[in-house]
Structure formats: structure tokens, C-alpha cells
């Protein structure tokens, strides 16, 4: 059996190696010729899987995408050919949640005020949005939710988008791309909606770039520097509008979900599904793939100080490093080369390929040397919190 896998998917050899021959490929440049002999195709969001890509293949047994979203997959086409498909919903939700939480701590540290005193609105309350809410609520932050798709079947309280914008100091976006219909999210934040943001609003986008009209965002941000931006996703990836980048407070190349646990979880979920399709038992464990936990002793009485919490979070992941590298890679390189799109493309994807996957909070085992209540740190995700 021939297994064709994106070169940036981790643990493919460890999980799929005894099922057949593995060939890794550049997912963004995948061609029908490369796919024609594959029995299994494993992709990420950079690969458009459709009739054109699979036009030369008549033996495909399974397509798996190690992603939450499926907007890059023509699921109707796969169904018409009876090709089993699976994605990995929720695989990197914890990573995205912690990324957004850390970004908010960074903004609070940079611009003053406390995150705990703010009201945060989450647009899209699925796996990733709920993970953000979990972190914030563990820390004691007031959270409001907007999600018209699930509000009728979900017991949580929801409000309209207009009300959320009017009431919230921070807005974090976690919706899939929907191009048409009642729940359209393409340019959900257009120029009018961007101009309706409260003074001093923090706006974070960790879902899809086109949820915000980036050209309108440039115009609004130039007129309203009070708005603070965290962008992990960009319209037109892998070629972000380079004039937008200097206007953004924290900028990264679509790596919010890039934790080691999240990436491993995505690959492992596809392994489980393929074994089910093949009628075989999944006899491998994800826990054997990951490095051991770190242990840190500290007096947790000091952590309620927000700067101390940020310091602890930076021990796991210092977002400033990726922000600095992103600006250097995209802006510095493009200024030296007339072929901006080519440079941005290479730099953007190269950053994603070479990204050192951070660990999630659970990888850090805290040993409490004080005598304070530590349940909130457990709820935030840290391991082994106790005395």
C-alpha cells in the first residue's frame, strides 16, 4: 500500500510505517501525477483535494486531513467515488486556545490594564472557541459567546454579534469559512463592522484570514490605532498583504494550532480512522510518541500576579519570538526583492515547515511549594498541580 503524506505532518512514519510505503510531498505543490498511484492520501489545509487532483487515481482507499476545517476538501466528490474521508476535529483546539490566551496576556502586558478585568467575546464556539473560553474562564475572565450555527442546540448562553461587539473589550474569532448563505463568514468583519468596534478593542483572528477583509482592516487600523490586532491567519495566504503587517501588534504565520500535542493528535486521529476503514485494530498509542513532561517547582501564591502568569506562559511558549521572526522573514526579505509574492510564499511556508512545535500547558508539571488554592491552574491545563 502506498501512503502519500504531507511532509509537514509529524509521526507519519511511526504510525503508518508498517502499513505500506510512505512518500512525503510538498502539500501546496501536489500534482495529479504524484497522487495517481496512492492508496492513502494524508494532507493539511494547504492542499486542495478535488476531482482535478485525483483525476489520474483510481485506487484511492482513504483521504485524511489533519485539520479541523474541511473547506479545502471536495467532500461531495469523494463521496461520489465512495472514497472514505476523515478530518481531525478538535485536534489542535487546545493549542489554539492557549495561543489566544497567551496573546491576550502579551497585549495586557504591553498596553497596560489586566486581562482579568476585560470582557472577552468569542465568535465561533466550536472546539477552538470553546478552548479559548476554557482558558479565560479558568483565569476568571468574563466571556461572551456568539455562534448562530449551534446556539439552538447548545445549552450555553449566546448573544448577537452586534451585542458582542458593543459589550466586549476583546474579540477572538474562531469560525470556519462559509462563503454564502445565512451564516456566511467570508468578510464577516468588513469595513462597517470593523469601524463599529469599541475604542481600544483587541481583535484576534486565529481561524481563517478571509473572515476579516484585510484591505478594509488596513484602512481602519490606519485611522484607528487604538484597535490592537493579533493575526495568525491572513487573507491570501501564503502571500499576506505586507502593508498590513506593521499595523499588527502580534503577527504569526498560521501556527496557532502548532503544538506538538496538537500535531500528534491530528496524525493519530487519521491513523485511528484508517485502521477502522481497513478493519484492523489501532494498536499504537499517542502517548508513546510525545516527550516526557517537564517539572517546575514554584510558589503558586505568586502566580495570580498577571505578569508572573505571563512569565510562566512564556516558559511554554514565547509568542514574541515568532512575531519577530515573521516580520523579519516577510518584511525584510520582501524589501530586498521585487518578486514579493514569491518571497512571501517561500518565507511564509518555510516558517510553518520549520516551526518548533511548542508544548501545551499540560506538558508542564507544576509542583506547588506554597499553600494556596491551585485548582484554577489545573483548570487552565497545567499538569500535576499540587503540593
UniProtKB/Swiss-Prot annotation:
<dbReference type="InterPro" id="IPR006140">
    <property type="entry name" value="D-isomer_DH_NAD-bd"/>
</dbReference>
<dbReference type="InterPro" id="IPR050223">
    <property type="entry name" value="D-isomer_2-hydroxyacid_DH"/>
</dbReference>
<protein>
    <recommendedName>
        <fullName>Erythronate-4-phosphate dehydrogenase</fullName>
        <ecNumber>1.1.1.290</ecNumber>
    </recommendedName>
</protein>
<dbReference type="InterPro" id="IPR020921">
    <property type="entry name" value="Erythronate-4-P_DHase"/>
</dbReference>
<dbReference type="GO" id="GO:0008615">
    <property type="term" value="P:pyridoxine biosynthetic process"/>
</dbReference>
<feature type="binding site">
    <location>
        <position position="257"/>
    </location>
    <ligand>
        <name>NAD(+)</name>
    </ligand>
</feature>
<comment type="subunit">
    <text>Homodimer.</text>
</comment>
<dbReference type="InterPro" id="IPR036291">
    <property type="entry name" value="NAD(P)-bd_dom_sf"/>
</dbReference>
<feature type="binding site">
    <location>
        <position position="147"/>
    </location>
    <ligand>
        <name>NAD(+)</name>
    </ligand>
</feature>
<feature type="binding site">
    <location>
        <position position="232"/>
    </location>
    <ligand>
        <name>NAD(+)</name>
    </ligand>
</feature>
<keyword id="KW-0664">Pyridoxine biosynthesis</keyword>
<feature type="active site" description="Proton donor">
    <location>
        <position position="254"/>
    </location>
</feature>
<dbReference type="InterPro" id="IPR024531">
    <property type="entry name" value="Erythronate-4-P_DHase_dimer"/>
</dbReference>
<dbReference type="GO" id="GO:0051287">
    <property type="term" value="F:NAD binding"/>
</dbReference>
<feature type="active site">
    <location>
        <position position="208"/>
    </location>
</feature>
<dbReference type="GO" id="GO:0033711">
    <property type="term" value="F:4-phosphoerythronate dehydrogenase activity"/>
</dbReference>
<dbReference type="Pfam" id="PF02826">
    <property type="entry name" value="2-Hacid_dh_C"/>
</dbReference>
<feature type="binding site">
    <location>
        <position position="45"/>
    </location>
    <ligand>
        <name>substrate</name>
    </ligand>
</feature>
<dbReference type="GO" id="GO:0016618">
    <property type="term" value="F:hydroxypyruvate reductase [NAD(P)H] activity"/>
</dbReference>
<feature type="active site">
    <location>
        <position position="237"/>
    </location>
</feature>
<dbReference type="Pfam" id="PF00389">
    <property type="entry name" value="2-Hacid_dh"/>
</dbReference>
<dbReference type="GO" id="GO:0030267">
    <property type="term" value="F:glyoxylate reductase (NADPH) activity"/>
</dbReference>
<dbReference type="InterPro" id="IPR029753">
    <property type="entry name" value="D-isomer_DH_CS"/>
</dbReference>
<keyword id="KW-0520">NAD</keyword>
<keyword id="KW-0963">Cytoplasm</keyword>
<dbReference type="InterPro" id="IPR006139">
    <property type="entry name" value="D-isomer_2_OHA_DH_cat_dom"/>
</dbReference>
<comment type="function">
    <text>Catalyzes the oxidation of erythronate-4-phosphate to 3-hydroxy-2-oxo-4-phosphonooxybutanoate.</text>
</comment>
<feature type="binding site">
    <location>
        <position position="258"/>
    </location>
    <ligand>
        <name>substrate</name>
    </ligand>
</feature>
<dbReference type="GO" id="GO:0005829">
    <property type="term" value="C:cytosol"/>
</dbReference>
<feature type="binding site">
    <location>
        <position position="67"/>
    </location>
    <ligand>
        <name>substrate</name>
    </ligand>
</feature>
<dbReference type="InterPro" id="IPR038251">
    <property type="entry name" value="PdxB_dimer_sf"/>
</dbReference>
<dbReference type="Pfam" id="PF11890">
    <property type="entry name" value="DUF3410"/>
</dbReference>
<comment type="pathway">
    <text>Cofactor biosynthesis; pyridoxine 5'-phosphate biosynthesis; pyridoxine 5'-phosphate from D-erythrose 4-phosphate: step 2/5.</text>
</comment>
<dbReference type="GO" id="GO:0046983">
    <property type="term" value="F:protein dimerization activity"/>
</dbReference>
<keyword id="KW-0560">Oxidoreductase</keyword>
<comment type="similarity">
    <text>Belongs to the D-isomer specific 2-hydroxyacid dehydrogenase family. PdxB subfamily.</text>
</comment>
Amino acid at each position: 500500500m502506498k501512503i502519500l503524506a504531507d511532509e509537514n505532518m509529524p509521526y507519519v512514519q511511526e504510525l503508518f510505517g508498517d502499513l505500506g510505503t510512505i512518500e512525503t510531498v510538498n502539500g501546496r505543490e501536489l500534482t495529479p501525477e504524484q497522487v495517481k498511484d496512492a492508496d492513502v492520501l494524508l494532507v493539511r489545509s494547504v492542499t486542495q483535494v478535488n476531482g482535478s487532483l485525483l483525476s489520474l487515481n483510481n485506487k484511492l482507499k482513504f483521504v485524511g486531513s489533519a485539520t479541523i476545517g474541511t473547506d479545502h476538501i471536495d467532500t461531495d466528490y469523494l463521496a461520489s467515488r465512495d472514497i472514505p474521508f476523515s478530518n481531525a476535529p478538535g485536534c489542535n483546539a487546545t493549542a489554539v486556545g492557549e495561543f489566544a490566551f497567551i496573546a491576550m496576556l502579551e497585549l495586557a502586558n504591553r498596553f497596560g490594564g489586566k486581562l482579568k478585568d476585560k470582557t472577552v467575546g468569542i465568535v465561533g464556539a466550536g472546539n477552538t472557541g470553546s478552548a479559548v473560553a476554557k482558558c479565560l474562564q479558568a483565569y476568571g475572565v468574563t466571556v461572551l459567546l456568539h455562534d448562530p450555527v449551534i446556539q439552538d442546540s447548545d445549552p450555553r448562553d449566546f448573544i448577537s454579534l452586534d451585542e458582542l461587539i458593543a459589550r466586549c473589550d476583546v474579540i477572538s474569532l474562531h469560525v470556519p469559512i462559509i462563503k454564502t448563505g445565512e451564516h456566511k463568514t467570508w468578510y464577516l468583519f468588513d469595513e462597517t463592522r470593523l469601524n463599529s468596534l469599541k475604542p481600544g478593542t483587541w481583535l484576534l483572528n486565529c481561524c481563517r484570514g478571509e473572515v476579516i477583509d484585510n484591505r478594509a482592516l488596513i484602512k481602519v487600523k490606519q485611522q484607528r490605532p487604538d484597535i490592537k490586532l493579533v493575526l495568525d491567519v491572513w487573507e491570501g495566504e501564503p502571500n499576506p498583504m505586507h502593508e498590513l503587517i506593521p499595523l499588527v501588534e502580534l503577527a504569526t504565520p498560521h501556527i496557532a494550532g502548532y503544538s506538538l500535542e496538537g500535531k500528534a493528535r491530528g496524525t493519530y486521529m487519521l491513523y485511528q480512522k484508517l485502521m477502522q476503514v481497513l478493519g484492523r485494530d489501532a494498536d499504537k498509542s499517542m502517548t508513546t510518541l510525545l516527550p516526557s513532561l517537564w517539572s517546575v517547582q514554584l510558589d503558586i501564591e505568586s502566580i495570580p500576579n498577571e505578569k508572573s502568569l505571563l512569565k510562566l506562559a512564556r516558559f511554554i511558549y514565547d509568542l514574541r519570538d515568532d512575531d519577530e521572526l515573521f516580520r523579519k522573514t516577510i518584511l525584510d526579505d520582501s524589501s530586498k526583492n521585487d518578486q514579493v509574492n514569491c518571497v512571501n510564499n517561500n518565507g511564509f511556508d518555510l516558517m510553518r515547515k520549520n516551526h518548533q512545535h511548542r508544548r501545551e500547558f499540560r506538558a508542564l508539571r507544576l509542583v506547588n511549594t506554597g499553600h494556596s488554592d491551585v485548582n484554577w491552574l489545573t483548570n487552565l491545563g497545567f499538569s500535576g498541580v499540587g503540593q
